[in-house]
């Protein structure tokens, strides 16, 4: 006696469910956009390791790829990627995947600050170079080892990520296809 069509179908469903729950999660891409003062903005892309996607808070150690591009009035002024990191590069990142939030507003180096190729003084991004900092004084950018005061905004301004890319003016773009 062979299996009935219903039994085969049920077995397929059970196997599919088992595979779905035992198949490891894949890495996830997140998109970043920041609007500063005086026409400064930043877009970026971050990839988290599969093991980090479900964590409450991830750090720079969980990031497998990262790139930011800086703009002034929509014109590219610089960029930085994790591939350019050296032993002297400032690289501090905190991110909450569930809320798509980068914690900001705290002392530099704390759990609520960011340093993407820019330290707390925003003066170590390289020459040529570009970086972003969020601490307790402001959120701002560094260009060619120089703090760009004009870019500064309130340190508590929310910094969110998206699952879709942003345009230069921080409008989420709907992927085609």
Regions found by a protein language model. Give the residues of each.
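Absolute protein N-terminus
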Residues: 1, 27-28
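Bacterial N-terminal signal peptides that target proteins for export
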Residues: 1-11
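Sec/Tat signal peptide C-region and signal peptidase I cleavage site
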Residues: 21-27
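Bacterial N-terminal signal peptides
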Residues: 10-20
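An extracellular/secretory-lumen and virion-surface interaction module
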Residues: 28-177
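N-terminal start-of-chain detector that recognizes signal peptides
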Residues: 5, 17, 39-41
